């Protein structure tokens, strides 16, 4: 699904890339736009076919994820709602994978999906408007740290040293990543790269 989405994104951005990023594969004529589009369809078809072989309910979640990916890829330029679509793509991975393992949609799956949605939304908003964090530090900070907050709230009856250490480490990593928006000249790429790396902790 991820690879198909990347191909579809490049297919959709062909005209933009010809004007602004001529070094990209399609404008540079390393591959044709038609071939890229066919590759996207092939990857999506493969994902749906494999999911159908495993679980019908999983395929329903996959179709919802596919719809969201396509909506994002086709409308992400100059669309104020595209960060929400990106966040939804990330969140829908959890119920899809859970259903592949015949797991019910339990509280911990919903919490994981909500945490991923929140973190991805904050990251996408910062990537689009780096100054947004300075304008709205509390709401944006809450979005970024929500995965740790949800985890601590969900496990409050069985807190362990590992849980506290992991949550603290995640919070410190977020604070370190956000330095690019505050210290010295604006360095949004530093913040974005480090927040992307933080997805391993979110998961």
State what each model feature region is:
Residues 91-203:
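C-terminal membrane-associated helical module and adjoining short loops/tails
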Residues 1-28, 35, 77, 123-134:
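Acidic (Asp/Glu-rich) catalytic motifs at the cytosolic membrane interface
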Residues 1-9, 65-73, 116, 120, ...:
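Alpha-helical transmembrane segments of multi-pass membrane proteins
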Residues 26-36, 53-58, 76-83, 131-137, ...:
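Short, amphipathic, aromatic/basic-enriched membrane-interface segments that mark the entry/exit
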Residues 48-52, 74, 175:
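Membrane-embedded alpha-helical segments of multi-pass transporters/permeases
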């Amino acid at each position: 699904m991820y690879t198909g989405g990347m191909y579809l994104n490049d297919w959709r951005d062909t005209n933009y890339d010809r004007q602004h990023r001529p070094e990209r594969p399609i404008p540079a004529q390393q591959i044709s736009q038609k071939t890229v589009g066919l590759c996207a369809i092939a990857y999506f078809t493969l994902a749906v076919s494999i999911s159908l072989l495993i679980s019908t309910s999983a395929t329903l979640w996959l179709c919802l994820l596919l719809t969201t990916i396509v909506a994002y890829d086709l409308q992400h330029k100059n669309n104020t709602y595209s960060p929400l679509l990106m966040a939804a793509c990330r969140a829908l991975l959890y119920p899809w994978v859970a259903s592949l393992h015949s797991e019910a949609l339990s509280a911990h799956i919903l919490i994981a999906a909500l945490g991923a949605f929140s973190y991805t939304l904050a990251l996408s908003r910062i990537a689009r408007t780096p100054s947004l964090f300075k304008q709205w530090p509390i709401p944006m900070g809450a979005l970024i740290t929500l995965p740790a907050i949800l985890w601590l709230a969900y496990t409050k009856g069985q807190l362990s040293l590992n849980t506290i250490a992991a949550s603290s480490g995640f919070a410190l990593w977020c604070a370190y990543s956000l330095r690019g928006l505050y210290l010295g000249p604006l360095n949004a790429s530093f913040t974005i790269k480090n927040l992307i790396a933080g997805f391993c902790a979110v998961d």
